[in-house]
Each structure stands twice: as structure tokens, then as C-alpha cells.
Amino acid sequence: MENTVIHVQADKGQYTITAIGMDQAFRRLIAFLLETRLMEDRRLIFLTDGAVNIRDRIERFFAFREHTIILDWLHLDKKCYEYMSMAVKGTKAEKDGMKRTLSSILWTGRADKAIKFLNGIKKKSIKNDRKLNELKDYILRKSPVLTCYALRHELGLKISSNRVEKENDLVVASRQKHNGMSWSDKGSGALAIIAAASRNNELDSFLVNKQIRFRLCA
């Protein structure tokens, strides 16, 4: 099992949760949300990279409460760009134009219009039918977790989970994945917990009193 990192943001505060294994991380997330009362009169929004195992955990652990899952915009845009690069042909300007058109459609979260656009690509512009169909399947699968990214962006709301990736780098990756270092699950988890406690401004409390405050930090 690997370290799982969850980053919570509410109002102007934040908190980093880490655990060995996704199930344990989600249990700690629920404990944190209950302790801080962040599930009271609030809308829960999960920004993810679209991984099925993450979505399954969210649906399982939060089945008791209304929530929203949003696919990370950067991940969606990159994935579609890669598929389009393999699926279409033409001059650079023509290919870039098709990619921009698809991106602008998905920016507003309209999966049905995106599929209609892809279906309308002329045969002479198709390089690989299989990749084009895979792109359509991908968009259809992800349609339940697409949103109007343009509106969220305009309102100053989050459209990407890149902050989680940054926290993962700070808590896990930068300390454990370089210099050919090898870690046991126990050692890796312990180091990640210490790093997270430091990020949460509760390292002294954790080391001296063996206590975690479970409070948002600035």
C-alpha cells in the first residue's frame, strides 16, 4: 500500500491528512470533518484526477451525505489533448484548432456537445479511429463528474486538485522518492505523518503530547 494524501480547504483554512492506504485516509477525513463540524450546513466538493478507486471510496464513505465530485480540469484537458494528438491529422494549425475547440466545449462542461463535435470530425481529418472512439468513451465515462469550469473559474472557485499534488510532493514525494531511498510501509507512513503535522502547525503537540488537534490552519 502507498501513502494517501488528502488536502482539505474551507474558508481561509486548510489541513493535510495522510495515511497508509486509501481506506484509512478516508476514515481520518471523516473524523476530521466531524471534529471540525465542516459537514454542518456545508456542501462537500471533492476535486479528483478521476481515478476510479478514489471515486469509489468517496461514494462508499460519504454515501450518507450529499456531495459533489468534480474532475480536475488540468487532468481532463491534458487527457483529451493527448487523445486528440493521436486521433486527428492535418496541418499543425488544423490540429491545434480542433484541440482548442474541444477544450473550449469541455471548459463549459458540455459532454454531449463535445461528443457531437467529435462525431462531426471529417474522415479526412481522422488519423486513428480507435483513439477517437477511446476519447469519446473517456468523455462519456467522466461526464457525471464534469462541471462548468468556466463559471467556477469566474467565481474564484477551485477547478483543479493540483494543491493536493503539491501537498503530496511536500509530505511524501520529496522526502521519500529521491536518492534511491527505500522505505518500509511503517517507516514511510510515520515520516509522512510527521511531515503532515508540520504542515498543519501541530508538530510540537504531536511530538510532545502525542496529540493531533484536528484544526484548520492558515
Short names for language-model regions:
Residues 1-218:
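Catalytic center-proximal scaffold of phosphoryl-transfer enzymes
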